[in-house]
């Protein structure tokens, strides 16, 4: 292992990819040695001296540890763009979040953030629709969107699934999606479910005068089957597909993004399984990195947490994810381990707040996120005492109250669906 990777005076070039890591050296290893091994293992080096690594090549491609704070257990490393296949998320992660997570020389390593250079951003298309395109697709410009997940998660047959979706639509939902673990099971086949639900979505549009979007899950065993399912939806007249981004894998997601553009379909990203490597604050990969990769690849909307619901995520973490979704230029924030990122005009993603939400939480959601959020409810709609239609209606009523600055209690006086929801979910 070379010893010249510590380069505190180095100023990253515009073409460098920069990463921030949290590192905890194992007992008996000093901080600088751990940082050196991390930088080398994630780029050009190995555990011992390599005869095939010429001085010229090493000087050209070596990483630069330009920031090291032992007290904060933080290092920043600048990598030459030549180390990467610029349009490949799997290759980038294999380098900066690959073997380094398994090294014995450190007890914990966490990739906190990646700042992508212009050359890499230019290799990606970003979202095809993005936030503005989704608003145009749905025909709603001035309020949050209301969505739901068909519940129960699994077990309904295709006919019942479509009926629950229809009731959600006529009650006021803009979007209805499959649950993340529903794909093509025997009790509810993908093709039959898609046909029936899209037909009832069209019926709900004609009855309500609003656009209604069904987000059918195309996550599949192979990329070939995933694309076949996507094209099946396209032929049925769908506008959307959803995909479980972590179980599917980054190669599958990049493939889907390319094919979805040709098909003219928007992409909804469900982040299930992300906590396997994002939740531990000392080891793995941050959700911030996952969100940035999603925008880079070009997903149109992404689950980011709720602050007020059942999912893990502090308010500042969720809002940092929101910023990476919607801002064109994200400023650096050392206290939050955020590197400056210029998205260079890539379209913003639509943030999705989902997980343990009820209509009573809508004022808080609106206060936290503003209008540019998709508020997505599961049990908060389908557990309404008056049924799914009333549950969706209660959500729209709560949103209308929030937009007008009226308390839910006052608005509920003339809206029985909301009044019933308050009786069930409002904390006494």
Curated annotation (Swiss-Prot):
InterPro entries: RuBisCO (IPR033966), RuBisCO_III (IPR017712), RuBisCO_lsu_C (IPR000685), RuBisCO_lsu_C_sf (IPR036376), RuBisCO_lsu_fd_N (IPR017443), RuBisCO_lsu_N_sf (IPR036422). Because the Archaea possessing a type III RuBisCO are all anaerobic, it is most likely that only the carboxylase activity of RuBisCO, and not the competitive oxygenase activity (by which RuBP reacts with O(2) to form one molecule of 3-phosphoglycerate and one molecule of 2-phosphoglycolate), is biologically relevant in these strains. The gene is rbcL. Keywords: Carbon dioxide fixation, Lyase, Magnesium, Metal-binding, Oxidoreductase. The keyword Lyase applies. The modification N6-carboxylysine is found at residue 177. Its cofactor is Mg(2+). CDD domains: RuBisCO_large_III (cd08213). GO terms for molecular function: magnesium ion binding; oxidoreductase activity; ribulose-bisphosphate carboxylase activity. Substrate binds at residues 153, 271, 303, 354-356, 376-379. It catalyses: 2 (2R)-3-phosphoglycerate + 2 H(+) = D-ribulose 1,5-bisphosphate + CO2 + H2O; D-ribulose 1,5-bisphosphate + O2 = 2-phosphoglycolate + (2R)-3-phosphoglycerate + 2 H(+). It is an enzyme of class 4 (lyase). Belongs to the RuBisCO large chain family. Type III subfamily. Pfam families: RuBisCO_large, RuBisCO_large_N. Gene3D superfamilies: Ribulose bisphosphate carboxylase, large subunit, C-terminal domain, RuBisCO large subunit, N-terminal domain. The keyword Oxidoreductase applies. One of its GO terms (biological process) is carbon fixation. This is Ribulose bisphosphate carboxylase. The active site is at residues 151, 270. Catalyzes the addition of molecular CO(2) and H(2)O to ribulose 1,5-bisphosphate (RuBP), generating two molecules of 3-phosphoglycerate (3-PGA). Functions in an archaeal AMP degradation pathway, together with AMP phosphorylase and R15P isomerase. Its EC number is 4.1.1.39. The record marks 310 as: Transition state stabilizer. Binds 1 Mg(2+) ion per subunit. Homodimer or homodecamer. In contrast to form I RuBisCO, the form III RuBisCO is composed solely of large subunits. Mg(2+) binds at residues 177, 179-180.
